[in-house]
A protein has these predicted regions:
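Glycine-rich phosphate/adenosyl-contacting loop at the front of the ribokinase-like
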Residues: 1-61, 66-70, 77
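Short, glycine-/polar-rich solvent-exposed loops and beta-turns at beta-strand/coil boundaries
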Residues: 89-91
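Ribokinase/PfkB-type carbohydrate-kinase core domain
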Residues: 1-11, 61, 74-87, 99-159
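Short alpha-helix plus adjacent loop in nuclease-associated cores
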Residues: 93-98
């Protein structure tokens, strides 16, 4: 299948908490909205593209924990192909708590890195990359470089 956008990411689970303003130290603040959602820079871009009608696929790895399974289901819910999303057995997925401040429109993020190893060059499905119109990257590691080289040779635009 040809995709409009293929993205390589280490997806995480975001717990988004929206408040009117951040509390003072030792203070409190009422939560206005909260949600669980798949996160990561590339993952967020893929969801936005899919909502606009693009055919998208995610390549990467998550843990086999409940957070990783949630991320996979969230991609599927948004119509994003997960055939290239690896589940690392017995490993955990990263978690971010995103605190959004309505008053300043700012945010603060606290996170826990999971133990799931990134996708390796040997695991990278190059055909998915070569058959895309665009390749979306957020990290500059050996997997991203390998994917970018293959994409360029195939005439795929990289961003």
């Amino acid at each position: 299948m040809k995709f409009d956008v293929v993205g390589i990411d280490m997806p995480c689970l975001d717990f988004a908490v929206n408040v009117d303003h951040f509390p003072e130290p030792n203070g409190g603040e009422r939560i206005r909205e909260l949600s669980w959602q798949g996160g990561g820079k590339v993952a967020t871009g893929l969801v936005a593209a899919a909502r606009l009608g693009a055919r998208c696929a995610v390549l990467g790895a998550v843990g086999s924990d409940s957070y990783g399974r949630f991320c996979e289901k969230d991609f599927i819910r948004h119509g994003i192909d997960t055939g290239g999303l690896l589940m690392r057995e017995g490993r955990s997925t990263s978690l971010s708590v995103v605190l959004s401040n309505r008053e300043t429109m700012g945010r603060a993020i606290i996170y826990n890195l999971g133990t799931a190893e990134k996708m390796t060059k040997e695991e990278l499905p190059l055909e998915a990359v070569k058959n895309a119109r665009y390749l979306h990257l957020a990290m500059l590691d050996d997997v991203a470089v390998e994917a970018a080289k293959a994409a360029r040779q195939a005439g795929v635009k990289v961003f």
